[in-house]
Amino acid sequence: MAKTTKRASSFRRLMIFAIIALISLAFGVRYLFHNSNATDLQKILQNLPKEISQSINSANNIQSSDSDLVQHFESLAQEIRHQQEVQAKQFDKQRKILEKKIQDLKQTPPEATLRERIAMTFPYDSHVKFPAFIWQTWSNDEGPERVQDIKGMWESKNPGFAHEVLNHDVINALVHHYFYSIPEILETYEALPSIILKIDFFKYLILLVHGGVYADIDTFPVQPIPNWIPEELSPSDIGLIVGVEEDAQRADWRTKYIRRLQFGTWIIQAKPGHPVLREIISRIIETTLQRKRDDQLNVNLRNDLNIMSWTGSGLWTDTIFTYFNDFMRSGVREKVTWKLFHNLNQPKLLSDVLVFPKFSFNCPNQIDNDDPHKKFYFITHLASQFWKNTPKVEQK
């Protein structure tokens, strides 16, 4: 019994030591673990600014690399655009050279008449669109600021149109460029004794080559050019657009006009090569060269009738009526006279010529909303007649 009690007491002491050892071991492990975590955390905190800095630097490097890449692409795109512009200029230059060679190859027969040579060099295609050109001429009598204002009005009403305002030097260069193969045209242009006659001649010439709209510099657009042709008409059926200049109501009309009803020349829209243009150019050539042979080139510029009958609206009117009454050209069977356009109040299409009323290209400065003609008001014309200020007679 005493021996059993001794064994039990020894076992209890052993258990107590074991428990104490386990507790000590647990505290030791915890202490070590705690110190280890603290050290790691401290290291992490110490290294954190460095890692953040590295990340920021890395991001900056990436951004810098992207910026360099974008700059490289922009530089490359600019270089490509420059090369395209250079190529476009080269192509345009080659095109002009090719056009000149093609024109040189258009050899007309030696026996061809003047009209045949003009027709072969500048053929007419009624099915092409009206070219989007606006042609105007500028004399020194119009100040450059005013010319720029007028040019701006035309361009604001007609975006997308090529618009050229040409002075006398440019006109001279263009005439010699386009018509060197028809010497009679060059001789006529040089022989015409005044600027106004040359400008009249040039307006027909430039429309013959390029087509589009010719407008005197003292005209102002009320509506865009594409609005001129009524919706019920097809542009492919029209080759020439003109307006009535004068529809005389008085018996003494001969003191101011060549014809009782005249078509104006301050606004003309045409397709290239139109037969009316070819004919009026031929008539001006014949008249001018005959006057040159007869030494009768002096002209009284203050007499409107002289200009109208030589290069202006009188000759223009006669040429158009000749076209109407030539069945082989116009296809019109009945005889056409001024009476067909007398008191015209809406556009009239005859053959491929669209004729507008007098008020269309000479509309009022003030337009009422209830004006019945409002939709056909296209142009305001000042009719400045700058040649009135020139000397009475110009001599070559």
UniProtKB/Swiss-Prot annotation:
Xref: Pfam families: Gly_transf_sug (PF04488)
Family: Belongs to the glycosyltransferase 32 family.
Other observations noted: Present with 7160 molecules/cell in log phase SD medium.
Gene name, Swiss-Prot/TrEMBL: HOC1
Entry GO CC: mannan polymerase complex
Keyword list, A-Z: Glycoprotein, Glycosyltransferase, Golgi apparatus, Membrane, Signal-anchor, Transferase, Transmembrane, Transmembrane helix
Taxonomic lineage of the native organism: Eukaryota, Fungi, Dikarya, Ascomycota, Saccharomycotina
Name of protein: Putative glycosyltransferase HOC1
Cytoplasmic compartment residues: 2-13
A biological process term (GO) from this entry: protein N-linked glycosylation
Ranges annotated as spanning the membrane: 14-34
Residues making up the signal peptide according to the UniProt record: none
Record carries keyword Transferase: yes
Cross-referenced InterPro entries: GlycoTrfase_DXD_sugar-bd_CS (IPR007577), Nucleotide-diphossugar_trans (IPR029044), Och1-like (IPR039367)
Membrane topology field: Single-pass type II membrane protein
Glycan-linked positions: 37
Organism superkingdom: Eukaryota
Positions in the Lumenal compartment: 35-396
Broad EC category: transferase
Self-association state and partner proteins as the record states: Component of the M-Pol II complex composed of ANP1, MNN9, MNN10, MNN11 and HOC1.
Primary location class: Golgi
Localization annotation: Golgi apparatus, cis-Golgi network membrane
GO molecular function: alpha-1,6-mannosyltransferase activity
